[in-house]
Amino acid sequence: MHINPLDTTLATFRIDYPFYKEGVGHAAVGALGQASLPYNYFERPQYRNFSFAEGFDVYTYRMENVPFYNLKRPYFHFMYLESGQKKFREENFSLTLGHNISPTTGFNVNYRSRGTKGLYEWSRTKNHNLSVAVSHTGKRYSVHAGFINNHIETRENGGVVGEWAIRDTTFEMPSGVPMKLTSSEATNTYRNNAFFVEQSYGIPLLPVTESDFSIANLPAVFIGHSFEYNSWSKVYKDIRGTYTDDRYERDADGNFVPQDGLEYYKNWFINPTQTRDSIYERVISNRVFIQAQPWDRNGVVGTVNGGVGLDLHTYSQFRLDSYLNGKYDKVGKSSYFVYGSVSYTHL
């Protein structure tokens, strides 16, 4: 868990793209809500599960980045921004509500909606992200729980019909750069639902006085449990369509010769007119851990950690057998973990 200051000055409100709040080294598809990837290899997301969602890492909520608030007064933040012409518009909607029931117990709701109609044909993206969180941080017992929903709809245009469409400065763009999958109406829809709860109980090895705000600076042993349910799915749809390349080749006189009836996909199986392909992945994770604190967290030996874990994986994707049988086949796998570590302070 990382403690972050609450930005009440709206210092970064003008930065629509979330990855620009960390730096400028990102390769983005282009518009708000669309996929991006850091140039720095060491900053790239490394998903052990749900790798097909890595491109939207800067937008999605996860167990690791769900915010929790500890407030003296109710906090409410609402924002709506839009920019660009109507046919290329980008929209950014943000809603945050936080309130403490008691000095140690609070809840909050965060909702983000970011999207664009895009500068190219068939490039609209809608990115919706919701987190609902509850926390309690007492002297000995603490619990953090949350629900996450990520929903992403993106149109897949397949790229420009030819490099000339973006390289030739004499080419006018009255209604968007022509793309290969515009007539195919290709879309990808991502859905994610997750629930998690992480709790721990501290057993101090020295008496706790009224002046002790917490037992973080006392010798103590912490026993904890972490549970997470996380499921992701992706559905791809399209219809069989063609595109035209107005500059497919040149004739003997050097003039451009157009070519129509071009297809993005060369082969069509099962259904000759449309496609529906899906993938689903679910992980149920359980962890039990213990943490010994011989002196305090800033001591020569800060903490000695250890624990065990069990992950239950479920996978399914559309295959030819699924079409013949009329149902999806699911594959289940289990992962077991035993881990330990020692944290210390450099002198």
Where are these regions (language model features)?
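Conserved small/polar residues in nucleotide/adenosyl-binding loops
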Residues: 345-346
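Outer-membrane beta-barrel translocator domains and adjoining extracellular loop/strand segments
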Residues: 120-126, 156-162, 235-242, 316-324
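Surface-exposed loop/turn segments flanking beta-strands in extracellular/periplasmic regions
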Residues: 162-175, 237-272
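Membrane-proximal, glycine/serine-rich, low-complexity loop/turn segments characteristic
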Residues: 1-194, 202-217
